[in-house]
A protein has these predicted regions:
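N-terminus-biased targeting/localization segments
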Residues: 1-286
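Helix-boundary capping/turn motifs
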Residues: 88-94, 264-269, 287-288, 438-439, ...
Length: 586
């Protein structure tokens, strides 16, 4: 079935008589005119009408990438990585605009008139280069307000969205009469639909009138809206949820701060913070931590430093309970001993130079494979990657947040590389032991190999020999504390030899040394090692989403890291990696 223009017109005439409609309903009805699989191109009227009601309306927190009010409903990624949108702005031409313009004049349905008129006003110049008449903005604004005033909306949240658009249009036109009409519509709407425990259905009068500098209002209007919000906040503190309370507290706090009423601001925000503390005490540790972080965020927004310190103390004290409440998930994998022995023998055969080079190459994480595993996980378990994850230390302190996939793919990749390194640690441990046994490796042999490279400062030789000796003796506590700072020294030497800078200006005068993560992100390191190896070093040494060895050991934060042979093996691997940097031979 491929609709003809007459069929489209008949459907639109039918919908014209329906007083309560939304754009989604119209879009679905239009789609129903066309067979799901059809080789015949649809008539132009079908495409024009479908696009008109398929466009989404953007919000202040989710702005359109086109720089317009309307935005695509869906964005697809093509196999070549390019984006494909529906509806696409490229399909809107002068004929499309003319069609919508004509429909705007023909229809008496308020929803349709608002949509057609606003499409012309919003997209005409963007798509055709021609400025539309301001009458389209006036027509859309009048229709939007009529919808709200006559309660012709299907969903309250849609009415609020249309009200926000009406304010934006009225302000852009500098039409004070219509802005006044929008103010009255807003006050009446909030009075009709507000529910204390549904914060999406109230507060918009404050946002659109009190907190909007471009809207003229009297002191009485301000006072009444704020008084209503204060009453609502009082009710919520008694029996409301944290989220509604936060929404009210932040609005009131912002208002009082702007008016210079700091005592009132602190009173409002403190009441919310105390509610968070009381709620956290009666909540499981994991929920309690999120509640305390919620309070911390609000206190920070309003620069209440004394209260911030109190919340931080509560978060720290909660740490052990948080760790105890976490579940342990284990997985087992078998490594056939014969295959492992055969593999290790292949690695350790030959002279020491060959062995060290093989170990370096084989145990560099494959970022490409980690990306592949991550992408497979996102595809197979999409829900698991929709939400952020907290990374905690052994005391329950949140040290970083990873994800979700849409906004923090890099963080998830670091987490994946970290997991892959842990899996390969068993094999690395076995191979290093075999190499030490096979070649009777002692501290001097390894140090001599390292110092064939020019990146190891002579001043660090004794300390490196001591750290390697402790590693070979099985004193991993000492080895980790000796070798970790040596790696940082070598990193600075590599950057210096490459013409980079290792100092940065201190705020109080003088200079600081650049930290490990800054060195690993430097252009010099990227030019020498490439992005994959630099990412590996960051995961191991400096990124809190990874192993973060340098931070944990040098700041005394990670007891496990201090004693870990797995960490020692990786530190030795990094030293061998650095040793691959040799002077050019002619």
């Amino acid at each position: 079935m491929n609709p003809e223009s007459q069929e489209v017109a008949s459907l639109m005439d039918e919908l014209e008589l329906v007083t309560k409609l939304d754009e989604r309903t119209i879009e679905v009805r239009i789609r129903g005119l066309r067979a799901e699989v059809s080789d015949e191109p649809p008539c132009r009227e079908f495409l024009y009408e479908l696009m008109a009601f398929a466009f989404m309306e953007s919000s202040a927190t989710d702005a359109s990438t086109w720089g317009t009010y309307f935005c695509p409903q869906m964005v697809f990624t093509n196999p070549d990585g390019s984006a494909r949108e529906f509806p696409s702005l490229s399909n809107v031409d002068e004929e499309t605009i003319d069609f919508w313009s004509s429909r705007s004049n023909q229809t008496s349905n308020m929803l349709m008139k608002a949509r057609y008129s606003d499409l012309v006003w919003d997209l005409c110049f963007k798509c055709t280069g021609k400025k539309p008449s301001h009458t389209f903005a006036l027509s859309s604004l009048d229709a939007l307000l009529s919808l709200i005033e006559n309660q012709l909306y299907m969903h309250s949240i849609d009415a609020i969205q249309k009200l926000r658009r009406a304010f934006a249009l009225g302000i852009s036109l500098s039409n004070q009469q219509l802005v006044e009409r929008a103010k009255n519509a807003a006050l009446n709407l909030e009075d009709k639909i507000s529910d204390d425990n549904m914060p999406g259905l109230w507060g918009f009068c404050f946002d659109l009138i009190v907190d909007n500098k471009r809207v003229r209002k009297t002191s009485e209007e301000d006072r009444q809206i704020v008084a209503d919000l204060e009453d609502r906040y009082s009710r919520l503190l008694s029996n409301g949820g944290l989220w509604p309370c936060e929404c009210a507290a932040k609005r009131l706090g912002k208002y009082y701060r702007a008016k210079g009423m700091n005592d009132e601001m602190e009173k409002v925000i403190t009441a919310f913070g105390e509610l968070c503390l009381a709620t956290a005490k009666d909540s499981p540790p994991m929920a309690a931590q999120q509640i305390l972080r919620q309070a911390y965020s609000v206190y920070k927004q309003f620069n209440m430093n004394e209260s911030l310190s109190k919340i931080l103390t509560e978060i720290k004290e909660l740490g052990p309970d948080l760790i105890d409440s976490m579940l342990t998930h284990e997985f087992r994998a078998e490594l056939p001993k014969e295959e492992l022995l055969k593999f290790a023998q292949e690695i350790v055969s030959g002279d020491c130079t060959q062995v060290f080079s093989r170990i370096v190459i084989h145990y560099l994480p494959s970022i490409r494979e980690s990306k592949q595993r991550l992408d497979e996980g996102i595809q197979q378990y999409p829900l698991a990657f929709l939400f952020p994850r907290n990374v905690c230390d052994r005391e329950g302190r949140v040290v970083s947040t990873v994800g979700p996939a849409e906004t923090d793919y890099d963080g998830l990749l670091i987490s994946q590389v970290s997991q892959d390194m842990a899996i390969y640690s068993v094999s690395l441990d076995f191979v290093l032991k075999r190499a030490i046994e096979e070649h009777s490796l002692g501290p001097q042999v390894i140090v001599e190999y390292l110092y064939a490279s020019t990146v190891f400062p002579s001043s660090q030789r004794e300390l490196l020999a001591s750290g390697i000796a402790k590693y070979l003796e099985g004193d991993y506590l000492s080895a980790n504390h000796i070798l970790t700072p040596r790696i940082e020294v070598v990193l600075r030497k590599i950057v210096e030899q490459s013409g980079g800078r290792v100092l940065k200006e201190a705020r109080a005068g003088g200079f600081y040394l650049r930290n490990v993560d800054e060195l690993l992100c430097s252009e010099e390191m990227l030019n020498i090692f490439g992005s994959d190896i630099c990412l590996y070093l960051r995961v191991l040494l400096s990124d809190p989403r990874g192993w973060n060895v340098r931070n944990d050991i040098c700041h005394g934060l990670g007891v496990d890291a201090c004693f870990s042979k797995t960490i020692s093996d990786r530190l030795v691997h990094v030293l061998l990696l650095f040793a691959q940097l040799r002077p050019k031979t002619v």
